[in-house]
UniProtKB/Swiss-Prot annotation:
One of its GO terms (cellular component) is mitochondrial large ribosomal subunit. GO terms for molecular function: structural constituent of ribosome. Keywords: Mitochondrion, Ribonucleoprotein, Ribosomal protein, Transit peptide. Component of the mitochondrial large ribosomal subunit. Mature mitochondrial ribosomes consist of a small (37S) and a large (54S) subunit. The 37S subunit contains at least 33 different proteins and 1 molecule of RNA (15S). The 54S subunit contains at least 45 different proteins and 1 molecule of RNA (21S). This is Large ribosomal subunit protein uL29m. It is found in: Mitochondrion. Belongs to the universal ribosomal protein uL29 family. GO terms for biological process: mitochondrial translation. The gene is MRPL4. It comes from Sclerotinia sclerotiorum (strain ATCC 18683 / 1980 / Ss-1).
Length: 191
């Protein structure tokens, strides 16, 4: 038998987990454990789909939608895409946690459904990356076009966008000037 060294030094009798037989499994006496109060909204609970059970049933695991397509995501704002990305990350963590628990408990079910669900989430993340890449390339192209546009000033001095008159407006101004009538131009747009 093995006895905890601290208990021997104190001269006390070992209790609970301190006294074990060699080669035996640890037997936990729940009455001797301290009850730890845990916050109901603890962040680690987000690694599990349910607070009261470690694994989802096959029906729960197979009950999921389709991945978001890039076409659907193109209309979303940056904040929406950012939120959806982190929701996907949390979902992949839940899937990985349940997969680990399933292997640990040798449950023997749910692996195929779990892989399908993970593939769905990964496809959504791939679509988010595609949309953000498209936006980045569009932004780069817009910068190149803006450098050659006389209405746009990227120097940081003064207004960014100064609209020019349309050709029709210029022709009307020339006619008005020749007749002596000049209209006031609208104020410039600043950003």
């Amino acid at each position: 038998m093995i006895c905890n060294a601290r208990q021997k030094e104190k001269g006390g009798k070992p209790t609970g987990l301190e006294y074990l037989e060699v080669g035996s499994r640890v037997r936990d006496d729940e009455s001797k454990r301290n009850k730890v109060k845990v916050d109901e909204d603890h962040g680690l609970y987000e690694f599990f789909r349910h607070k009261d059970k470690a694994l989802s049933t096959p029906a729960e695991e197979g009950n999921h939608g389709r991945p978001w397509s890039a076409e659907e995501l193109r209309g979303k704002s940056w904040e929406d895409l950012h939120s959806l990305w982190w929701i996907c990350c949390k979902e992949r963590n839940r899937i990985a946690t349940e997969s680990y628990e399933r292997d640990r408990l040798e449950a023997g079910y749910g692996e195929e459904d779990s892989e399908k669900r993970d593939m769905t989430v990964r496809r959504t993340q791939r679509a988010i990356k595609q949309v953000l890449t498209e936006r980045y390339y569009s932004w780069q192209e817009a910068q190149v076009v803006a450098k050659d546009d006389p209405e746009i000033d990227l120097s940081g001095q003064g207004p960014i966008y100064t609209p020019r008159d349309f050709e029709e407006d210029i022709e009307e101004e020339v006619l008005a000037e020749s007749e002596g009538e000049v209209e006031q131009k609208p104020a410039q747009i600043t950003a």
